[in-house]
Structure formats: structure tokens, C-alpha cells
Design a protein with these regions (language model features):
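N-terminal secretory signal peptides that target proteins for export/translocation
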Residues: 1-12
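Well-ordered beta-sheet/strand-loop patches within structured domains
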Residues: 2, 32-80, 87, 165, ...
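N-terminal capping/interface segment
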Residues: 7-8, 18, 364
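C-terminal motif of bacterial Sec signal peptides marking the signal peptidase cleavage site
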Residues: 27-30
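Eukaryote-specific, cytoplasm-facing alpha-helical/coiled-coil scaffolding segments in long proteins
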Residues: 186-198, 521
Length: 537
């Protein structure tokens, strides 16, 4: 018989003819099964004449078996990639120790058995497979087929690690990565023949993602006495998540369960908050709700908004509102010039009726619409702008914040737009229903009335002060009193996408998945989700 290589060390090895039998003996220290076990309470003397190759543990063979599992593993999540990398790099085994499959595995499985409460399937975390295989090990139920001791040990080690990383990284940071699937959703152009596809960037919310430090901590915790506490700590510490989880526990309708699961996942994401506003103010725009929420410590102002159409979606982002411009000039984006403006090149009436003017970018000179062609406008050499004031597409005021998409919040010249229920029609910017009220909110309650009146007068609104009324009564005076106002301190802005949203009254409101983001997220979550969620009913 081939002598097994030394794998584990134990002071009672002198009682056994081979080191591996000592390890088998020590497996019983961790046996917690209450079922009848024919190998129960064995002593060292029981093994005195027992030499059987099927109990021979071989460290190298276990690692070879794990590498074979790695090669066959086609799971594509980041956590599965990390598990494969761990064993390819020949790092230490996490779950097998001197006492066999120790109690840390039981601690992990105990936590994993709760995944049904978050709508997930135990199968996605290999719970039944692990329990069966661990029971085999603890009962010495090996054979020469699929349950050889080294193959069984390798299988348990690898599946425990995959389940562990899936759970702790998923619960801490989210089981999906919106940077990947939302930013590879909409092609940047309609050229289907391009060798390298470019996509529109739709998600730019700063978030904390798992890094090397967290990964190292998770691996260290797998062997630590604090494993149970660590597994508790990675669970979402979020009141909204807990409320949605409680709703999931009583919800039986599959479609509504998916609605809950998608919005629970959004609560797992570790969004990096913008700088705190000293006055406790922040603005949230929820795209599916077509609403803006302006929060103050003691009140919330809500208003309707309009957002980007499905082909020109409003990007999700975090920023700070830092300025407002009154009667802004609109520099028309190149995408709109190419699609909507260039076909009218040479038509002077089209340009003058809309108060558009054309500027040569190189010389700064204004060019007559009659002298340009569509190819000239599409070349990028010419800027097309719309004069500020009445009739401007941006309305009478615009609210600016730093972002890489050239989007902003603004007024609109089409006030009836807000009578529509579905208001996804823009090229990406956000139209707001009550622009002056919003300006007043941003400036704060302690702002002087004359500044507010100058904004009102410049927007052709009725002034509120005697000074303002006197000014507008003099028809010789200009009504353009102010062009730009800084927002100090800056007010945090969050443009989000939540199809379940808790209002300021504490009520959960449900909204249509207008951009299809829930549907995309569902595909990402399906591998984890319990079968009773998967069929719409």
C-alpha cells in the first residue's frame, strides 16, 4: 500500500500505523450530528490493525482536486473569480484544519441557511451539497467513485469558499455591480458594424466596492473565532433594507417579490455621500417617480420633474448644486445638432424663429444660417446656440452642478409638459416644475428679499418687495437684473433610480420601470434567487 503523505499533525499519531488514520480519528472531535453513527466513539485501539487506502489523505492530491474544480468552474461573478484566484495562487486552505472540517464551517452554513429571508436560494450557496458532503466526512462514508476522501475534502473546501465569498461580499457591497451592467447597456452610437462597441455612461454614483483590504479581511475571518460576528457585520445596516425585507417575508406575488428584491439590492450598494450641507439640505431626484425631493431638517419640498427619454436616459449620479444662471444661453449639444438641427441647414426661418445662432468655433464670428450646410454643422466646427430669455428651451433659470454628462436641472418654456403622467422626453437633462421655489430653497430662508426679487424680475415674475415693484413700474429700466448666483453652501444632489421609494410621509410608493433597469438587474440576480420568485404570476 502506498504510504500517505503527512498532512496534519497530532500528538496521538504514534498510536496509528499511518499519519492519515490519526486525522480520520480526529474528525470525530467536530462531529455534531445527532443521527446514529456506526463509527461513533471510536478509540485509537480500534484502528490498530486498520489500514485502508481510501482513508489516505494527501495534501497535494486535495490541491490537485481543487484545481480541477477551478478549471471546470464557469461561474462569472466577481466573487467566483476571487475564489478561483485564491486556489490558483496556492493560498492556504480555509476550512480544513487539524481537526478536519471544523466548527467554522458549521458557523458559516448556519448563516447561509438564512438566505431564504432575503429571497435567495440555498442552492446558490451549495447548502444541501455541503451538508451532505460534511456528513459523509464525519461518518467516514467514502468510496472509490465520486466520494474519494481527497476529492470530497476538495469539494467541501472549494464550495465553502465560494459560498462564503458570495455571501459576505454580496451582503456588504451588493450582489450586482451597476458600473458594469448599466454602463454596457446603451450603445453610444448606431454604428452596428464598429469592431469596438462604445456605450453610453449611465451610472456615475461613487460607491465603495470590495477591495484587497476587504478581501484579505474576509479570508482571515474564515479562520477566526469572530467569524459569526463578521458574518453579522456584513449584513446591510440599513433601515430601508430591513423594511423591504419585512415586506418580502409576507409577499407571495412573484412580480412584487422581484420589485422588492431589486430595490433591496439598491439598498446594499455603499453609495459615497456628497459633502454634508451645513443647513442639512439635500436634493434627491428619483427618475421612475418623475419627482424631485428637496429635503430640509424639518420639511420636504416635492415637485414634478421631466427626465431623459429611453434613448437618451438621464444618468444616475451624485454631485453638488453650486450655481444658478438666469436667462441662460443654450449651447445645443452636438447629438441634437446632428439629429434635429443639421437637416434644416440653409433654412433661415427655422433658425430665426427659434432664436438660434451659429458661431464659427475657430474665429468666434456669427455665421448666417443661409450660408451653412448640414455637413458643416455636423463637422463640429460650428456651435449652435439659442438666445436666453422667453422661449428658450432651458426656460428662465438653470441649476448647475459638476458632472461629466453636461446635464443639469432647468426650467422649461413648455409648462403644459408637467400635465403628462410619463415625462421621459428630454435629451438627458431634468426639467423642474417650480424653478423659482427651488431657487429659493437652494439659497436658504435667510437670503435677502432683494436678491430674490432680482431673480423674480429677471425671470419676468411678479416682485414681492416695494423696491422690486418700483423697479418694474419704470419701463425704462432693464428687467435683467441678475445673471448668475452662487449656491453657498453647495447643496448635495442625488439622481437615483428606485422603483420603490419611501416618501416624506413614510409611505412606500411603487413606480414603473421606465428605463428597464429592474429588468436588467433581475437577470443579474436570478442565479441567486429562490425558485418561488422566478416565475411571474
Amino acid at each position: 500500500m502506498k504510504q500517505a503523505r503527512r498532512f496534519f499533525h497530532n500528538p496521538i499519531t504514534t498510536l496509528l500505523p499511518i499519519v492519515t488514520l490519526c486525522f480520520v480519528m480526529s474528525l470525530f472531535h467536530s462531529c455534531t450530528q445527532s443521527a446514529s453513527n456506526p463509527n461513533k466513539d471510536l478509540t485509537a485501539e480500534a484502528f490498530a490493525g486498520f489500514v485502508n487506502e481510501q482513508y489516505g489523505l494527501d495534501a497535494d492530491d486535495i490541491r490537485r482536486c481543487i484545481i480541477n474544480l477551478v478549471k471546470k468552474d464557469n461561474d462569472s461573478t466577481q466573487t467566483d473569480w476571487l475564489a478561483r484566484k485564491l486556489y490558483k495562487d496556492n493560498k492556504r486552505l480555509l476550512w480544513i484544519d487539524t481537526y478536519g472540517i471544523g466548527d467554522k464551517a458549521d458557523t458559516l452554513i448556519s448563516h447561509l441557511k438564512n438566505v431564504g429571508g432575503i429571497g435567495f436560494s440555498e442552492k446558490s450557496f451549495y447548502i444541501a451539497d455541503l451538508e451532505n458532503d460534511i456528513q459523509r466526512i464525519r461518518s467516514l462514508d467514502f468510496d472509490d467513485r465520486a466520494n474519494k476522501i481527497n476529492e470530497l475534502m476538495a469539494r467541501v473546501e472549494y464550495k465553502l469558499t465560494k459560498a462564503y465569498l458570495r455571501y459576505c461580499i454580496g451582503q456588504q457591497f451588493g450582489f450586482t455591480n451597476p458600473y458594469k451592467y448599466l454602463n454596457r447597456l446603451d450603445p453610444a452610437n448606431e454604428d452596428t458594424t464598429a469592431k469596438v462597441k462604445e456605450y453610453r455612461h449611465l451610472f456615475d454614483i461613487p460607491m465603495k466596492r470590495p477591495d484587497d483590504d476587504f478581501y484579505a479581511k474576509a479570508l482571515n475571518m474564515a479562520n477566526a473565532e469572530e467569524l459569526g460576528a463578521f458574518l453579522c457585520s456584513v449584513e446591510p445596516q440599513n433601515a430601508y433594507f430591513n423594511e423591504l425585507c419585512a415586506k418580502l417575508a409576507t409577499e407571495r406575488n412573484a412580480k412584487r417579490r422581484w420589485l422588492l428584491l431589486c430595490n433591496m439590492e439598491r439598498q446594499r450598494w455603499k453609495r459615497t455621500e456628497a459633502n454634508d450641507n451645513p443647513k442639512g439640505r439635500k436634493v434627491v431626484v428619483n427618475i421612475p417617480a418623475f419627482r424631485l425631493y428637496a429635503y430640509s431638517p424639518d420639511s420636504t419640498m416635492e415637485m414634478k420633474v421631466g427626465c431623459g427619454a429611453t434613448k437618451t436616459k438621464t444618468p444616475l449620479l451624485t454631485s453638488e448644486i453650486n450655481r444658478m444662471d438666469i436667462n441662460p444661453l443654450w449651447n445645443i449639444p452636438m447629438s441634437i445638432i446632428k439629429k434635429d438641427v443639421a437637416p434644416h441647414a440653409g433654412n433661415s426661418h427655422y433658425f430665426t424663429s427659434r432664436r438660434y445662432f451659429i458661431v464659427d468655433r475657430n474665429t468666434g464670428k456669427i455665421i448666417s444660417p443661409a450660408n451653412v450646410t448640414s455637413s458643416m454643422l455636423r463637422s463640429g466646427q460650428y456651435r449652435v446656440s439659442q438666445e436666453g430669455g422667453e422661449g428658450n428651451s432651458l426656460g428662465r433659470i438653470i441649476f448647475r452642478f459638476d458632472n461629466k454628462f453636461s446635464v443639469y436641472l432647468h426650467d422649461t418654456s413648455s409648462r403644459k409638459f408637467f400635465e403628462q403622467n410619463v415625462r421621459s422626453v428630454s435629451h438627458g437633462c431634468i426639467r423642474i416644475e417650480r424653478p423659482f421655489d427651488f431657487a429659493q430653497y437652494l439659497l436658504g430662508d435667510d437670503e435677502d428679499e432683494w436678491k430674490l426679487d432680482r431673480i423674480r424680475i429677471s425671470m419676468d415674475l411678479e416682485p414681492k418687495t416695494e423696491r422690486g415693484l418700483k423697479h418694474v413700474s419704470d419701463t425704462t429700466k432693464s428687467r435683467r437684473l441678475i445673471n448668475s448666483v452662487k449656491v453657498e453652501p453647495k447643496v448635495p444632489l442625488y439622481i437615483v433610480y428606485q422603483t420603490l421609494f419611501k416618501t416624506s410621509e413614510g409611505k412606500w410608493e411603487e413606480y414603473k420601470d421606465i428605463y428597464g433597469y429592474d429588468a436588467v438587474m433581475r437577470k443579474q440576480l436570478e442565479p441567486f434567487v429562490a425558485s418561488n420568485n422566478k416565475n411571474d404570476k
